[in-house]
């Protein structure tokens, strides 16, 4: 019988501690205190992060703290604080530790300790000119192959099918033809299952030692990924000559002395890459298709440009089109974990004095809200590729500078995403092929009723809730050119 009062006492003690922690903010950092006491900020932020951050900024200014019960987020707003955030050293505010908050349940223990070496290998292995040329050919092949399949269907779901295309390219390029031939569909299924659970509130509200369904499912997916990699890598060992000249990224990491000894972490590394490369690349392509349908003038301008541009990857109009999509539909926030206390610039929050961000908290900025700041972008809610063009060339007027960062869908400076070039290449291949070769229209159900129903549940840029359906038929002019 003694167990019951002890358990009650422990629970009561935990609730008291949580309430006390929530009621004792950092001396210098204001809290919005929106909604119910203790849990109100966490609930409002989880329900609608964009509207919450806007409301909190109006109430508190450019620096404020969001309490999430067992942790807290220090939010920084404004172009100058964006620059300060992105220039802060990794040993002070860690991107790797920030990713670990989401990914620790889908990567094996020890991987995050080697994150720097693995990311460096991505920089070296993926952006090699010979590799990028090979990956570009693969992306073009996959675009043509899957679009032919779409044309045979009554209609398609845009985000779902762009997800399949992107996944096919990523698996062939990064993992290799053997993963593509044997595990393509299973890998996509594992990715979708992990996406469904990775952002579950339990991961933030409960300590790691508390078991729950989303964590168990993520662990199962992690273990299956590891089994797939073990199977394929063992098969490569039995036939090394076949893979000697392969240009896939796994082949590169197996040959590189700086990563070959880390093969036990390859499954975890490619799990991270699938998350990093997939969600935002899909969003870039899918939203561009939808916005071109909504804006026929821009669609015709892009068709005209692509008819004469010799190289789609240097087409100013295509680059501007995708750049505008990345601005309009970027991720809601970037996160880093504060390893050390760090003082913000003296003018970070006028009237608040010197603010020190404490250690052991999340520090965040918002690409989405920066990209929708009317002081930087006129009519920010209007999708307009011409804002990036001047006299038919790419404009430099919106470019970030040494003191401010106003555009950063892929990060900035030394914290720029190493996969940016590959993601852009994948998107350009598909969008150019669709515009030049196919007639895309809304399906019989018509366009979505509300294009502002943004889904930020994935790690990366927003998708459209409920997706959108279109028909894809080969264009007569495209048939003649083919």
Swiss-Prot record:
One of its GO terms (biological process) is secondary metabolic process. SUPFAM superfamilies: Cytochrome P450 (SSF48264). Coiled coil: none annotated. Pathway: Secondary metabolite biosynthesis. Residues 1-22 form the signal peptide. Disruption phenotype: Leads to the accumulation of pyranonigrin J. The keyword Oxidoreductase applies. Keywords: Glycoprotein, Heme, Iron, Metal-binding, Monooxygenase, Oxidoreductase, Signal. It is an enzyme of class 1 (oxidoreductase). Gene3D superfamilies: Cytochrome P450. Cytochrome P450 monooxygenase; part of the gene cluster that mediates the biosynthesis of pyranonigrins, a family of antioxidative compounds. The first step of pyranonigrins biosynthesis is performed by the hybrid PKS-NRPS synthetase that condenses 6 malonyl-CoA units to an acetyl starter unit, to form a 1,3,5-trioxotetradecane-6,8-dienyl-ACP. The enoyl reductase (ER) domain of pynA is likely to be functional during the first two rounds of polyketide chain extension, to generate the saturated C-C bonds of the alkyl side chain. PANTHER family: 24-HYDROXYCHOLESTEROL 7-ALPHA-HYDROXYLASE, CYTOCHROME P450 FAMILY 7. Belongs to the cytochrome P450 family. This is Cytochrome P450 monooxygenase pynD. It comes from Aspergillus niger (strain ATCC MYA-4892 / CBS 513.88 / FGSC A1513). The lineage of its organism: Eukaryota, Fungi, Dikarya, Ascomycota, Pezizomycotina.
